[in-house]
C-alpha cells in the first residue's frame, strides 16, 4: 500500500478521487491500494533562537551572531493533530512507500521532507511531479512516479534557503533593532528589494528637469527637428521656415515583422495583470492557485515560457479552450512549434488554460479568477499566432537648410496583436510623396518639452527589476540571477508593505510602490552585503547550483555564517541616525529585556522593539486593586530603578490605606510586581 501526502486537503481530495480512495477517515482517505492524506502548508517551522539557548529569549548584542550547530524544526501547536496522523500513517506496516504529492517545487519539497524526517520515517519516497490538476494529468503522473532521490538536491536547496533566511532574519533584525532602538525587521531578500525602491526614489529626487525645444512644420503631414537646448535656435529655424517650401530629400519604406511574445511564466503574467488589470502580484498568484486547484489552468509557480516538445500535438486543443475562455475566434493559423521547446522548460512548462477550461461557465468564477484566466488564455492565443506585420515609412525633408523627419506606420497583417487587450495608438499613415518633390509649409511652430525623471516603481516594473536583480536591458536569453524566485516575489512585496517599509500610493490609474521614511532610513544604515541586489541574486543562483548538485550545501551555509560574523564584528553605527527612526511617542525609559526604548500608549507602556513582548499595562490588577494608577512618572521610576515609592495604597482586607514601595519583576517572558515595606 502507498501513502500519498499532498500539501493541502483540497489537492488531496482531487488526487484521492482519481486513485479511488473514497473511504473517509479522520485526516485521510483510503481505497484502491492508497492512503491519501495532507499537510496544511508548512506543518513544521524552524525553532526560535530560545529553543537552542534559553538565554537568547532576551535580545543582546553580546549573543550575536546566533548560529546553531544543527537546526531544529518544531510542529506548530495548531497543526500537531495532523502531524500526528501523518506520523501514524507512515508507521503503518501496510505502508510500503510514501508518495510526495506536495507542490512540485522547492517549498513543496521542504514541506514534505520536514514532516517525513520529523516523523522518523525511512520508507522509500516516490515523487509525483505534475503541472496540472486535471484527472488525466494526475493519472499520468502516478504512472510515471519518480524516485525521491532524484529530488534530494531540491530538498537541500530548500533547506539551505530556509536556514539562510532564519540566520539573516534573526541576527540582522536583532542587531539593527538593538543598535538603533527600534524594531527593524530585516530579511535576506526583503532588504535588497527595498534598496531598489529607495535607490529609484533617490534618482527621482535628484533629477533636475531640463527644457528642450523642437520645431514642427505642417507640410501636409507633421515633420519635426531633433531636440534643441536653446530656445533662440528653435525660434530662428521656425522663423526661417515660415512661408517657405520644403524639399523631400528621402523616402524610406520598410516592411517589418514583430514575433509574438512567448507564453506566460508567473512573473510575466503577474506583470501584465498589474499593468492591465491593476492586480497586485499576490492577488494574481492567489487567483492562479485557485484556478489550478479548480483544474482550469496549469501550475502557476513556473519560470518557463514554453511548453515541452511532446505537448505539440495537444496545442490545438489548448488553443480551442483558450478561445472559448475569451469568447474569441482562434487564430487562422496555429503555429504550435513556436511555443514548444523542451530545452527552455525547467521544472514546469508555461502557464496556459487547461482543456477543462473550454467547458467552464465563466460567469460562475469570481471576477479576479475570471480576468486572470482570460489573460492567460489571450497569452496562449497570442503566442501561437503569426507575426505582426507592418510597413514603416520615414520621410526626410529640408527647409531653410534644416532637416525635418516624419514617421508613419501602416499595419499589413495584425497577427498576434489582434489579441492585445491594450491597443497602442499607432503612428499615422503618411501621404505618398517622392524624392525632390516640393511641398508648401502652412505652419512652423516651436514645441517645448522637458526631460522627465525615472518613474516610480509599480509592481509590474519592480517584478521586472527583481527578476534581473536591478539590471536593465538584460537579453532574453541571458541567464537570470534574480532576487527571489517567481514563487516568492509577491510575498516579499507584501511583507515589505505589512512591515511598514513600503506603501502603495495611487496616482490616477496607476498604483506606485514607494518606500516609507522608515524604509528609506533602514537602507541608509544597512551595510552593502544586506542590501545588494546583485549579491542576493548570486545567493539565489547558488541555491540553484545546490539543487543541481554542483556545489555542497555546507559551502553556501558557511558563506552566510561568515557574512554574519563579519557584520557583527565590523559594522559601525552611523552617527546621528537616531533621528531616522522616531516613533512619535514619548519615551519613558529603557526596556529591561532588550534595551530598546519604552514609550507610552493609551493602554500601557510598550517596548518599541516589536519582537520584544515587554509591556507595563495601565489597567494591571495589581494597581487597580490598590486604587492606584500606573502613571508615566511611576513607570519611568520602575524602568530606571526597578522600584518606586507608592503612597496611599488601598487594602482590600482592612479597607485602610498604607505606604510602601513597588518592585518590578520580569523573568524575560512575564512582568509582575511585588510590594515591599521600608522595614522589609
What does each model-found stretch correspond to?
Residues 1, 101-104, 181-183, 253-262, ...:
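Conserved short loop/turn motifs at secondary-structure junctions
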Residues 1-162, 166, 453:
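Intrinsically disordered, low-complexity regulatory segments
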Residues 2-3, 79, 90-93, 118, ...:
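Basic, low-complexity terminal or inter-domain segments flanking catalytic cores
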Residues 9-16, 33-36, 40, 76-87, ...:
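Amphipathic alpha-helical transducer elements in NTP-driven molecular machines
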Residues 30-32, 218-221, 398-402, 654:
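Short strand-coil-strand connectors
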Residues 137-219, 253-257:
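C-terminal or mid-to-C-terminal helical accessory/interaction module adjacent to the motor/catalytic core
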Residues 232-264, 270:
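Metal- or metallocofactor-binding catalytic centers and their adjacent structured scaffolds
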Amino acid at each position: 500500500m502507498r501513502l500519498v501526502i499532498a500539501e493541502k486537503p483540497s489537492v488531496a481530495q482531487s488526487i484521492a478521487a482519481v486513485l479511488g480512495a473514497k473511504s473517509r477517515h479522520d485526516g485521510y482517505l483510503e481505497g484502491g491500494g492508497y492512503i491519501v492524506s495532507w499537510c496544511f502548508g508548512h506543518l513544521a517551522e524552524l525553532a526560535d533562537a530560545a529553543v537552542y539557548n534559553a538565554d537568547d529569549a532576551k535580545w543582546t548584542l553580546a549573543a550575536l551572531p546566533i548560529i546553531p550547530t544543527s537546526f531544529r524544526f518544531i510542529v506548530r501547536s495548531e497543526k500537531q493533530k495532523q502531524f500526528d496522523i501523518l506520523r501514524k500513517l507512515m508507521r503503518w506496516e501496510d505502508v510500503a512507500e510514501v508518495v510526495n504529492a506536495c507542490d512540485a517545487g522547492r517549498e513543496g519539497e521542504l514541506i514534505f521532507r520536514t514532516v517525513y524526517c520529523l516523523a522518523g520515517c525511512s520508507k522509500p519516497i516516490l515523487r509525483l511531479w505534475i503541472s496540472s490538476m486535471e484527472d488525466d494529468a494526475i493519472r499520468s503522473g502516478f504512472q510515471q512516479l519518480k524516485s525521491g532521490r532524484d529530488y534530494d538536491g531540491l530538498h537541500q536547496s530548500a533547506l539551505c534557503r530556509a536556514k539562510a533566511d532564519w540566520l539573516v532574519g534573526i541576527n540582522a533584525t536583532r542587531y539593527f533593532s538593538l543598535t538603533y532602538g527600534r524594531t527593524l525587521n530585516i530579511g535576506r531578500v526583503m532588504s535588497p528589494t527595498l534598496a531598489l525602491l529607495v535607490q529609484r526614489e533617490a534618482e527621482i529626487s535628484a533629477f533636475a528637469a531640463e527644457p528642450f525645444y523642437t520645431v514642427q512644420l505642417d507640410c501636409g503631414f507633421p515633420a519635426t527637428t531633433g531636440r534643441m537646448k536653446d530656445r533662440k535656435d528653435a525660434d530662428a529655424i521656425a522663423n526661417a521656415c515660415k512661408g517657405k517650401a520644403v524639399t523631400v530629400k528621402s523616402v524610406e519604406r520598410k516592411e517589418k515583422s514583430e514575433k509574438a511574445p512567448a507564453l506566460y511564466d508567473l512573473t510575466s503574467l503577474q506583470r501584465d495583470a498589474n499593468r492591465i488589470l491593476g492586480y497586485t502580484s499576490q492577488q494574481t498568484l492567489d487567483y492562479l492557485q485557485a484556478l489550478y486547484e479548480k483544474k482550469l489552468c496549469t501550475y502557476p509557480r513556473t519560470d518557463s515560457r514554453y511548453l515541452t516538445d511532446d505537448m505539440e500535438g495537444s496545442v490545438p486543443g489548448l488553443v480551442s479552450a483558450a478561445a472559448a475562455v475569451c469568447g474569441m475566434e482562434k487564430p487562422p493559423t496555429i503555429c504550435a512549434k513556436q511555443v514548444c521547446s523542451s530545452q527552455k522548460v525547467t521544472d514546469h512548462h508555461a502557464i496556459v488554460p487547461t482543456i477543462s477550461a473550454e467547458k467552464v461557465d465563466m460567469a460562475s468564477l469570481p471576477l479576479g479568477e475570471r480576468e486572470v484566466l482570460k489573460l492567460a488564455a489571450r497569452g496562449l492565443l497570442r503566442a501561437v499566432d503569426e507575426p505582426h506585420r507592418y510597413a514603416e515609412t520615414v520621410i526626410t525633408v529640408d527647409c531653410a537648410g534644416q532637416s525635418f523627419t516624419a514617421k508613419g506606420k501602416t499595419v499589413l497583417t495584425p497577427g498576434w496583436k489582434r489579441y492585445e487587450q491594450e491597443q497602442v495608438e499607432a503612428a499615422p499613415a503618411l501621404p505618398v510623396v517622392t524624392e525632390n518633390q516640393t511641398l508648401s509649409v502652412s505652419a512652423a511652430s516651436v514645441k517645448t518639452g522637458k526631460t522627465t525623471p525615472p518613474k516610480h516603481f509599480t509592481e509590474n516594473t519592480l517584478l521586472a527589476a527583481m527578476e534581473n536583480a536591478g539590471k536593465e536591458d538584460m537579453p532574453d536569453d541571458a541567464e537570470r540571477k534574480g532576487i527571489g524566485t517567481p514563487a516568492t516575489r509577491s510575498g516579499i512585496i507584501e511583507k515589505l508593505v505589512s512591515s511598514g517599509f513600503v506603501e502603495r500610493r495611487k496616482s490616477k490609474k496607476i498604483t506606485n510602490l514607494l518606500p516609507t521614511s522608515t524604509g528609506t532610513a533602514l537602507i541608509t544604515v544597512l551595510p552593502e552585503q544586506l542590501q545588494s541586489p546583485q549579491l542576493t541574486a548570486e545567493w539565489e543562483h547558488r541555491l540553484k547550483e545546490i539543487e543541481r548538485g554542483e556545489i555542497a550545501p555546507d559551502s553556501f551555509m558557511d558563506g552566510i555564517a561568515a557574512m554574519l560574523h563579519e557584520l557583527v564584528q565590523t559594522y559601525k553605527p552611523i552617527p546621528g541616525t537616531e533621528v531616522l527612526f522616531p516613533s512619535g511617542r514619548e519615551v519613558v525609559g529603557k526596556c529591561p529585556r532588550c534595551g530598546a526604548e519604552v514609550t507610552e500608549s493609551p493602554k500601557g507602556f510598550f517596548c518599541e522593539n516589536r519582537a520584544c513582548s515587554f509591556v507595563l499595562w495601565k489597567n494591571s490588577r495589581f494597581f487597580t486593586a490598590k486604587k492606584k494608577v500606573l502613571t508615566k512618572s511611576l513607570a519611568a521610576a520602575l524602568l530606571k530603578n526597578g522600584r518606586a515609592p507608592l503612597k496611599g495604597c488601598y487594602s482590600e482586607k482592612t479597607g485602610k490605606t498604607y505606604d510602601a514601595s513597588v518592585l518590578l519583576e520580569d523573568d524575560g517572558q512575564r512582568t509582575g510586581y511585588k510590594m515591599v515595606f521600608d522595614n522589609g
